[in-house]
UniProtKB/Swiss-Prot annotation:
PANTHER family: CENTROMERE PROTEIN Q. This is Inner kinetochore subunit fta7. Its main location: nucleus. Keywords: Cell cycle, Cell division, Centromere, Chromosome, Chromosome partition, Cytoplasm, Cytoskeleton, Kinetochore, Microtubule, Mitosis, Nucleus. It comes from Schizosaccharomyces pombe (strain 972 / ATCC 24843) (Fission yeast).
Protein backbone atom coordinates (compact mmCIF):
# COMPACT_ATOMS: atom_id res chain seq x y z
CA UNK A 1 0.00 0.00 0.00
CA UNK A 2 1.46 3.34 -1.05
CA UNK A 3 1.52 6.17 1.50
CA UNK A 4 0.06 9.55 0.53
CA UNK A 5 2.06 12.67 1.17
CA UNK A 6 0.44 15.34 3.33
CA UNK A 7 1.71 18.92 3.71
CA UNK A 8 0.54 21.21 6.52
CA UNK A 9 1.55 24.84 6.98
CA UNK A 10 2.49 25.73 10.57
CA UNK A 11 3.58 29.12 11.84
CA UNK A 12 7.05 29.47 13.28
CA UNK A 13 5.91 30.98 16.59
CA UNK A 14 3.55 28.04 17.09
CA UNK A 15 6.42 25.62 16.49
CA UNK A 16 8.60 27.45 18.99
CA UNK A 17 5.88 27.56 21.66
CA UNK A 18 4.16 24.18 21.40
CA UNK A 19 6.47 21.81 19.59
CA UNK A 20 9.08 19.93 21.57
CA UNK A 21 12.05 17.68 20.60
CA UNK A 22 11.64 13.92 20.58
CA UNK A 23 12.11 11.99 23.78
CA UNK A 24 14.95 9.51 24.15
CA UNK A 25 12.51 6.60 24.05
CA UNK A 26 10.96 7.87 20.82
CA UNK A 27 14.36 8.30 19.19
CA UNK A 28 15.30 4.76 20.19
CA UNK A 29 12.05 3.46 18.68
CA UNK A 30 12.82 5.22 15.40
CA UNK A 31 16.34 3.74 15.32
CA UNK A 32 14.95 0.27 16.06
CA UNK A 33 12.46 0.60 13.19
CA UNK A 34 15.30 1.56 10.84
CA UNK A 35 17.42 -1.39 11.96
CA UNK A 36 14.53 -3.84 11.69
CA UNK A 37 13.73 -2.73 8.17
CA UNK A 38 17.40 -2.82 7.18
CA UNK A 39 17.71 -6.52 8.10
CA UNK A 40 15.33 -7.49 5.32
CA UNK A 41 17.56 -5.74 2.80
CA UNK A 42 20.89 -6.86 4.26
CA UNK A 43 19.83 -10.51 4.35
CA UNK A 44 19.37 -10.50 0.59
CA UNK A 45 23.13 -9.87 0.14
CA UNK A 46 24.86 -13.21 -0.40
CA UNK A 47 28.47 -12.05 -0.13
CA UNK A 48 29.59 -11.79 3.50
CA UNK A 49 32.11 -9.07 2.63
CA UNK A 50 29.53 -6.90 0.92
CA UNK A 51 27.07 -7.54 3.74
CA UNK A 52 29.56 -6.36 6.40
CA UNK A 53 30.38 -3.25 4.34
CA UNK A 54 26.67 -2.48 3.94
CA UNK A 55 26.07 -2.89 7.69
CA UNK A 56 28.98 -0.56 8.48
CA UNK A 57 27.70 2.03 6.01
CA UNK A 58 24.17 1.80 7.45
CA UNK A 59 25.41 2.27 11.02
CA UNK A 60 27.25 5.41 9.96
CA UNK A 61 24.06 6.72 8.35
CA UNK A 62 22.12 6.00 11.57
CA UNK A 63 24.65 7.95 13.59
CA UNK A 64 24.26 10.89 11.24
CA UNK A 65 20.46 10.66 11.49
CA UNK A 66 20.41 10.34 15.28
CA UNK A 67 22.17 13.68 15.89
CA UNK A 68 19.58 15.87 14.06
CA UNK A 69 16.75 13.88 15.69
CA UNK A 70 17.79 15.18 19.12
CA UNK A 71 16.93 18.77 18.15
CA UNK A 72 14.03 18.04 15.80
CA UNK A 73 10.82 19.66 17.14
CA UNK A 74 7.64 17.63 16.77
CA UNK A 75 4.00 18.37 17.70
CA UNK A 76 2.44 16.90 20.79
CA UNK A 77 0.42 13.72 20.69
CA UNK A 78 -3.33 14.12 20.26
CA UNK A 79 -4.30 10.46 20.54
CA UNK A 80 -2.72 7.38 21.97
CA UNK A 81 -0.60 5.69 19.35
CA UNK A 82 -0.25 1.93 19.01
CA UNK A 83 2.01 0.19 21.47
CA UNK A 84 5.43 0.02 19.91
CA UNK A 85 6.53 -2.87 22.11
CA UNK A 86 3.70 -5.09 20.87
CA UNK A 87 4.39 -4.18 17.27
CA UNK A 88 8.10 -4.85 17.75
CA UNK A 89 7.49 -8.25 19.38
CA UNK A 90 5.12 -9.32 16.60
CA UNK A 91 7.63 -8.20 13.98
CA UNK A 92 10.41 -10.12 15.73
CA UNK A 93 8.26 -13.27 15.78
CA UNK A 94 7.53 -12.91 12.09
CA UNK A 95 11.21 -12.31 11.42
CA UNK A 96 12.26 -15.45 13.30
CA UNK A 97 9.69 -17.47 11.39
CA UNK A 98 11.01 -15.94 8.19
CA UNK A 99 14.58 -16.96 9.06
CA UNK A 100 13.51 -20.53 9.80
CA UNK A 101 11.63 -20.68 6.51
CA UNK A 102 14.67 -19.33 4.67
CA UNK A 103 16.86 -22.00 6.26
CA UNK A 104 14.35 -24.67 5.30
CA UNK A 105 14.29 -23.36 1.73
CA UNK A 106 18.10 -23.49 1.59
CA UNK A 107 18.05 -27.11 2.77
CA UNK A 108 15.42 -27.98 0.16
CA UNK A 109 17.45 -26.25 -2.54
CA UNK A 110 20.55 -28.25 -1.59
CA UNK A 111 18.55 -31.49 -1.67
CA UNK A 112 17.13 -30.49 -5.03
CA UNK A 113 20.64 -29.91 -6.39
CA UNK A 114 21.76 -33.34 -5.14
CA UNK A 115 18.72 -35.07 -6.63
CA UNK A 116 19.19 -33.20 -9.90
CA UNK A 117 22.83 -34.29 -10.09
CA UNK A 118 21.83 -37.89 -9.37
CA UNK A 119 19.13 -37.74 -12.00
CA UNK A 120 21.64 -36.42 -14.56
CA UNK A 121 24.05 -39.24 -13.74
CA UNK A 122 21.27 -41.81 -14.05
CA UNK A 123 20.24 -40.34 -17.38
CA UNK A 124 23.84 -40.52 -18.63
CA UNK A 125 24.10 -44.14 -17.52
CA UNK A 126 20.76 -44.90 -19.15
CA UNK A 127 21.88 -43.31 -22.43
CA UNK A 128 25.14 -45.27 -22.33
CA UNK A 129 23.23 -48.51 -21.80
CA UNK A 130 20.94 -47.67 -24.71
CA UNK A 131 23.93 -46.94 -26.93
CA UNK A 132 25.61 -50.20 -25.90
CA UNK A 133 22.40 -52.06 -26.59
CA UNK A 134 22.10 -50.48 -30.04
CA UNK A 135 25.74 -51.31 -30.81
CA UNK A 136 25.25 -54.93 -29.74
CA UNK A 137 22.08 -55.19 -31.81
CA UNK A 138 23.91 -53.90 -34.87
CA UNK A 139 26.73 -56.36 -34.22
CA UNK A 140 24.27 -59.21 -33.95
CA UNK A 141 22.61 -58.18 -37.20
CA UNK A 142 25.99 -57.88 -38.90
CA UNK A 143 27.09 -61.30 -37.66
CA UNK A 144 23.81 -62.80 -38.75
CA UNK A 145 24.18 -61.43 -42.27
CA UNK A 146 27.77 -62.65 -42.47
CA UNK A 147 27.18 -66.09 -41.01
CA UNK A 148 24.26 -67.08 -43.18
CA UNK A 149 26.28 -67.82 -46.37
CA UNK A 150 28.71 -70.02 -44.46
CA UNK A 151 25.87 -71.77 -42.75
CA UNK A 152 24.20 -72.36 -46.08
CA UNK A 153 27.45 -73.66 -47.51
CA UNK A 154 27.90 -75.94 -44.54
CA UNK A 155 24.35 -77.12 -44.91
CA UNK A 156 24.92 -77.92 -48.59
CA UNK A 157 27.93 -80.05 -47.69
CA UNK A 158 25.93 -81.83 -45.05
CA UNK A 159 23.19 -82.37 -47.64
CA UNK A 160 25.67 -84.19 -49.88
CA UNK A 161 26.77 -86.36 -46.98
CA UNK A 162 23.25 -87.18 -45.88
CA UNK A 163 20.84 -88.76 -48.29
CA UNK A 164 17.73 -87.73 -46.47
CA UNK A 165 16.58 -84.20 -47.35
CA UNK A 166 14.58 -83.97 -44.14
CA UNK A 167 17.81 -83.96 -42.15
CA UNK A 168 18.97 -80.89 -44.11
CA UNK A 169 15.71 -78.96 -43.50
CA UNK A 170 15.80 -79.91 -39.85
CA UNK A 171 19.41 -78.67 -39.51
CA UNK A 172 18.56 -75.34 -41.23
CA UNK A 173 15.56 -74.82 -38.98
CA UNK A 174 17.65 -75.63 -35.93
CA UNK A 175 20.35 -73.10 -36.87
CA UNK A 176 17.73 -70.39 -37.49
CA UNK A 177 16.08 -71.04 -34.14
CA UNK A 178 19.46 -70.91 -32.36
CA UNK A 179 20.23 -67.54 -33.96
CA UNK A 180 16.85 -66.09 -32.99
CA UNK A 181 17.15 -67.50 -29.48
CA UNK A 182 20.60 -65.94 -28.94
CA UNK A 183 19.36 -62.57 -30.19
CA UNK A 184 16.26 -62.70 -27.96
CA UNK A 185 18.30 -63.69 -24.91
CA UNK A 186 20.72 -60.81 -25.48
CA UNK A 187 17.86 -58.32 -25.76
CA UNK A 188 16.27 -59.69 -22.59
CA UNK A 189 19.59 -59.43 -20.77
CA UNK A 190 20.01 -55.73 -21.61
CA UNK A 191 16.39 -55.01 -20.79
CA UNK A 192 16.91 -56.54 -17.34
CA UNK A 193 20.02 -54.39 -16.87
CA UNK A 194 18.10 -51.25 -17.83
CA UNK A 195 15.22 -51.90 -15.41
CA UNK A 196 17.04 -50.65 -12.22
CA UNK A 197 18.14 -47.47 -13.99
CA UNK A 198 14.60 -46.78 -15.19
CA UNK A 199 13.15 -47.28 -11.70
CA UNK A 200 15.83 -45.08 -10.12
CA UNK A 201 15.21 -42.31 -12.65
CA UNK A 202 11.49 -42.43 -11.92
CA UNK A 203 12.14 -42.19 -8.15
CA UNK A 204 14.47 -39.21 -8.59
CA UNK A 205 11.98 -37.51 -10.89
CA UNK A 206 9.21 -37.90 -8.28
CA UNK A 207 11.50 -36.51 -5.56
CA UNK A 208 12.39 -33.55 -7.76
CA UNK A 209 8.71 -32.76 -8.32
CA UNK A 210 8.00 -33.00 -4.56
CA UNK A 211 10.90 -30.69 -3.73
CA UNK A 212 9.77 -28.16 -6.33
CA UNK A 213 6.24 -28.16 -4.86
CA UNK A 214 7.61 -27.70 -1.31
CA UNK A 215 9.77 -24.77 -2.43
CA UNK A 216 6.76 -23.14 -4.10
CA UNK A 217 4.72 -23.50 -0.88
CA UNK A 218 7.57 -22.03 1.19
CA UNK A 219 7.93 -19.13 -1.25
CA UNK A 220 4.20 -18.35 -0.97
CA UNK A 221 4.51 -18.45 2.84
CA UNK A 222 7.43 -16.00 2.70
CA UNK A 223 5.44 -13.63 0.51
CA UNK A 224 2.55 -13.74 2.99
CA UNK A 225 4.90 -13.04 5.90
CA UNK A 226 6.48 -10.09 4.08
CA UNK A 227 3.02 -8.70 3.23
CA UNK A 228 1.94 -9.05 6.88
CA UNK A 229 5.06 -7.25 8.10
CA UNK A 230 4.65 -4.46 5.53
CA UNK A 231 0.99 -3.98 6.54
CA UNK A 232 2.02 -3.66 10.22
CA UNK A 233 4.70 -1.10 9.39
CA UNK A 234 2.34 0.87 7.12
CA UNK A 235 -0.31 1.00 9.86
CA UNK A 236 2.22 2.35 12.38
CA UNK A 237 3.45 4.94 9.86
CA UNK A 238 -0.12 6.06 9.11
CA UNK A 239 -0.90 6.49 12.78
CA UNK A 240 2.23 8.58 13.28
CA UNK A 241 1.31 10.77 10.29
CA UNK A 242 -2.20 11.29 11.73
CA UNK A 243 -0.69 12.27 15.04
CA UNK A 244 1.47 14.83 13.26
Amino acid sequence: MEMKRRVRAVRRDQIQKRWRPLEDKQRQEIIIIFRTCSRLVLNTIKSETRKSLAEEWFMNILLKIEAPLRNLPVPRKRKESILFSQLLSSNMQLEQQLYSDLDHINVLQQELKVETARLENEQKSYEEMKQNMAINNSRLADLKSKLHPYLKKGLKISHDNFSDSNDFSFQKKLNTEDSNTSKTSTLDMYKEKLKPFTKTMQIHANKTVQLSQTIQKATLLLQRLNNTKNIGLNKSSKLKIKNI
